[in-house]
């Protein structure tokens, strides 16, 4: 067997999904940072998003950095049914699960941190539980964006958790998250050009602070 034959195939995303909730009352909340990430990609790549009833979400496609075709999706099913929308796209285009990259919020990561992985559990995130159920596997890449924990909250304080994830960032946090989203675009562009595993080395090693420009 040649050395080339033993090299693992690069995982290159073909569909990028941002998780969130529809309705204006959820706009710019911490739980909707996945939506914000896909919107940032849409602006950067000049791919317009439009509501697609068949896909139960806002959908767009175009050419991404690296020259390949890329699809963007914001499920409009509400968070805990996100998998329905994702499955509608993957079934229509016959995309394998490993070609789907899902972006979502993570309270266990501090603000300014991101984590890119090739697979994993839902980690208690209802949107990811739905995605895993509808894709029938955990083996697809995901990018978690840290939103931090509510200040001074006990781990079992569910009401505080809900108000935190459905709350909005402060002015200073918004500035920081703007930089985080720029970094997310860079990480995803690297994953499209060199594969998710290569992008992990960059995405997982930095903390984005307000001092960066």
UniProtKB/Swiss-Prot annotation:
Q: Which GO terms describe its molecular function?
A: peptidyl-tRNA hydrolase activity; tRNA binding
Q: Hydrolase: is it a keyword of this entry?
A: yes
Which cysteine pairs are joined by S-S bonds? none
Name the residues annotated as catalytic in the UniProt entry: 31 (proton acceptor)
Mention one GO biological process in which this protein takes part, according to its record.
Answer: protein quality control for misfolded or incompletely synthesized proteins
Q: Where is this site: Stabilizes the basic form of H active site to accept a proton?
A: 105
User: What residues correspond to the site Discriminates between blocked and unblocked aminoacyl-tRNA?
Assistant: 21
Subcellular location, in the record's words?
Cytoplasm
Catalyses: an N-acyl-L-alpha-aminoacyl-tRNA + H2O = an N-acyl-L-amino acid + a tRNA + H(+)
Q: How does it assemble?
A: Monomer.
Q: What does this protein do?
A: Hydrolyzes ribosome-free peptidyl-tRNAs (with 1 or more amino acids incorporated), which drop off the ribosome during protein synthesis, or as a result of ribosome stalling. Catalyzes the release of premature peptidyl moieties from peptidyl-tRNA molecules trapped in stalled 50S ribosomal subunits, and thus maintains levels of free tRNAs and 50S ribosomes.
| Name this protein carries in UniProt | Peptidyl-tRNA hydrolase
Native organism is Nostoc punctiforme (strain ATCC 29133 / PCC 73102)
Tell me the name of the encoding gene: pth
């Amino acid at each position: 067997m040649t050395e080339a034959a033993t090299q693992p195939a690069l995982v290159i995303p073909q569909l990028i999904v941002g998780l969130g909730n529809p309705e204006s009352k959820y706009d710019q909340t911490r739980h909707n940072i996945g939506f914000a990430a896909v919107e940032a990609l849409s602006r950067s790549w000049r791919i317009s998003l439009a509501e697609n009833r068949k896909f139960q979400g806002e959908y767009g496609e175009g050419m991404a950095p690296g020259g390949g075709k890329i699809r963007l999706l914001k499920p409009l099913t509400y968070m805990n049914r996100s998998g329905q929308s994702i499955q509608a796209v993957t079934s229509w285009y016959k995309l394998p699960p490993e070609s789907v990259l899902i972006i979502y919020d993570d309270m266990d990561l501090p603000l300014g941190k991101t984590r890119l992985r090739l697979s994993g559990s839902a980690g208690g995130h209802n949107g990811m539980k739905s995605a895993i159920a509808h894709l029938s596997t955990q083996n697809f890449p995901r990018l978690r964006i840290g939103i931090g924990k509510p200040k001074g909250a006990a781990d079992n304080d569910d009401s505080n958790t809900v108000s935190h994830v459905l709350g909005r960032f402060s002015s200073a946090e918004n500035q920081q998250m703007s930089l985080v989203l720029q970094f997310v675009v860079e990480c995803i562009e690297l994953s499209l050009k060199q594969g998710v595993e290569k992008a992990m080395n960059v995405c997982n090693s930095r903390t984005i602070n307000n001092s960066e420009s």
